[in-house]
Amino acid sequence: NLDQSLAEQRNARYLHMIEIYKHAGFEPYLSYAESIDDIKLSLNNHLPDLVLCGIDHLPENGCNISHNVHAWFEEHNVNYIGSDYKVIELALSKGLLKQKWQTYGIRTPVFGLIREKPEECNEDIESLLSLNAFPYILKPENLGNSRGIDENSIVWNEAELRKALDKMRLQFGGVILAEHYLGASADFREITCAMIEGSSGMLFMPAEVSLVEPKRFHIITTRDKDKNGTIANPLDADTAASFLPFAERVFAIAGVRDYSRGDFILADGEFWAIEINGQPMIPDQWFGSAALFAGLSEEKYLVGIVASGYRRLKAEGRLAQV
């Protein structure tokens, strides 16, 4: 069973992370949560000084409510590591984040949002056709980590667009993002960039990401990530030197803090911002690889993430002592 195998692998990674934190002098505990009620119980049982949570939203038992977990933490005075809830919502909305980048002159592929109601959907499709930016790649607007995309998400004409849109609607519903697909460019390269906020500012750690088994057109799916179908390599020095000022602006405009990871593309001789993961589920293969290329061991980057949150909270007067 693939799902069970993945769950076992993830659990092993979490337990390994806990051992790293113990070795570094923390008193950590691992807790799984499927609802806000689970978090309440865990907080009451352990009374933590700091919380690192990889889940952005959770339901409340008996209520038709989905809570932004970081917003809930703030409402209940829980000290947490990571970006504030407004930034999490912005990062989860690909369209809003791309609009903000455009406002500040950040290069991001031409895109359009396709709403759900039939009359609005047709209007949005017409807008996309008028942009004439084929090929497009379709993505659920509010899902990250490559969820919801596969090779059939790349469309080259109106007929393929409508077919792929109908399929994605059945599976996910909601607003769909269609953006110009850059993978057909001859110089295409995908870059991931991890960020940890240190005592002297943000440390940006880029890596080039590719497929173990190349496809006709480059697209990394959730399955590729889960089945170790990707490989990360250091970014060459010249490309990194050109890339880092662009990445710094992209992260700053997104408003992230403590730690984050961004996805970028190099195509047609330019860097393009694709999306930001405002709440990476640590430990993360790409984050760890990028950190390693920057000279940080697994222990150093994991402890560095906790240190970033601790440092910020102490400066805010939220933590009294080490």
Predicted segments, located by residue:
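Phosphate-binding site of ATP-dependent enzymes
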Residues: E158-D238, P245, D268-W272
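ATP-dependent carboxylate activation and anion-phosphoryl transfer catalytic cores
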Residues: D236-V322
